[in-house]
Amino acid sequence: MRSYFEKPRSTVGWKGLINDPYLDDSFKISEGLKIARKLLLEISEIGLPLATEALDPITPQYLQDLISWSAIGARTTESQTHREMASGLSCAIGFKNGTDGSLEVAINAMQSAVAPHRFLGINPSGQVSIIHTRGNPDVHVVLRGGSNGPNYEKEAVLKSEQQLQGKGLDPSIMIDCSHANSNKDHKNQSKVLDNISEQIREGNESITGVMIESNIGPGNQSISDKLEYGISITDACVGWDLSLIHI
């Protein structure tokens, strides 16, 4: 289950449950971490693996033992800090292509993350330490489209396979049905998923997963004093009924 607690922003805005859990600019981060961990534990107890976005390099020491898969977002895939962090995370990592649609930054990130690194970080006791990582072999690319348009269709997937193989990387591809692939319209996620399903029926073996932005109710809402339960306050999502059909 996609359980994102940190929100990267193009400029400013609500940065997620960990950063501001009460949506009131009180920024009670210590409480946000506890709430996030409690939710992860509850979801784990019903047997669902958990996926999140690795954004703040400190956060994984508090949550990583409950995470099965992490994304490195389009804005941070090019960041050395996030590549180093990914090299030491104990889960599979999906690197998104750049916001311009380029796959090169994700490929470079994958090559970096599979290698060992040394960098400053915190240890499990919260002390500043020199971190030594072994490299993470479980990395792959996430196609999310870009400023030049979507990249989920057959031709784009084939090109991605060729680029990955050309660099000696496993052509394991996850496709993000949202963001630029949906033209930022949550209703288009069904169209994207239909196209992906057809590619798999035709014999594609490189597509190993999809990402769907879903919530209890469809759409989204602005942060206010009167929030409707189960409706996203960030990106627009498909509702739960449609999510079940997608699955």
Language-model segments: which ranges?
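Active-site-facing alpha/beta catalytic cores
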Residues: 1-152, 156-157, 179-180, 184, ...
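Conserved active-site beta-strand-loop modules that form the wall/rim of enzyme catalytic pockets
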Residues: 139-140, 171-173
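Redox- and metal-dependent alpha/beta enzyme cores, enriched for Fe-S-associated oxidoreductases
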Residues: 160-167
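Short helix-terminating capping/connector loops at secondary-structure junctions
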Residues: 167-170, 204-206
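Conserved, mostly hydrophobic/aromatic
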Residues: 175, 239
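Short helix/strand-capping connector loops at secondary-structure junctions
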Residues: 221-234
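Conserved small/polar residues in nucleotide/adenosyl-binding loops
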Residues: 245-247
